[in-house]
Structures are given as C-alpha cells and as structure tokens.
Amino acid sequence: MDLCYVLHADHGMNASTFSSRVTIATLSDVYSAITTAIGTLKGPLHGGANEGVIKMLKEIGSLDKVDAWVADALAQKKKIMGIGHRVYKTLDPRAPHLKRMAQVLSAQLGEPKWIQMSDRIAEIMLREKHLNANVDFYSATVYYSLGIPKIGRAHV
C-alpha cells in the first residue's frame, strides 16, 4: 500500500492538489483543504476512475469477451476508463508499478481474471488508438484484489 500512496501522492499539480491549494490560498484551515482534495479525488475523471475500470471489467465478464466488448465500445465512441492521460501522452510512469502489483496480487489470490482482462484491453487500446493504460487502470485491480470497497456516491 505504501507504493500506492507514493504513486498517487507524488504526482505534481493534479486536480486534487490544485483544489486543495486553492482552498489553502483562501486562508482556510488544513482540514478544509484535505476535504476539498478528497472531494476532487472522488470524481470519476480523477481518483474515482479506478471504480469505472472495475465496473467495466465486471461488465465485460471474462477474457474471451474482451475483444468484442472493446470493439463495440470503440465503434460507439465510448470512453475506456483508465486508458490515456491528459499529461502523459506516452506511458504513465506510475502504471508499470501498479501493473506489477496487480500481477503479484492476482497470482497470490489465484484470481488472474482481472489482470488478464486488463492486459488484453491495454494491448488493444495501444494497438488501435495508440493510448496507454494509466495509473487508474491497474490500481483498479490492485484495490479490488485488496478488498478495498468502492467510494459510495451521494444520492441527491
């Protein structure tokens, strides 16, 4: 888990860092800044993207359905969660570390399904769209394998 914390925290000026800095700049307290950062991190296009990845993998269901699912998603111009990055136009340098963690956890748990599906999706997206998996793509399998529950969404 320490590696996950470092990979997510030591990442420059992302959305959650920016939002917390804006809060602090108003001379608010540190608790408000942390709350702001967590609220931003929860968004599905920032830290919450890994929830979208697991949801996608569960929807696909099995390795033999990946190719057809991705082809259909691309034909419908759907966003493939965890693929591509606004800053990293090549490989997200954090992704290989989380990929290795996902592989190790999958092997230890005897549950290779999620990492196999993820690897296949990443391979297809690199070939078809020249987009790499990002940090959220593999952290989804890591966190799911560790039994970390998803963040609940408020119903308004």
Where are these regions (language model features)?
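Non-transmembrane, aqueous-exposed alpha-helical and coiled segments at domain scale
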Residues: 1-153
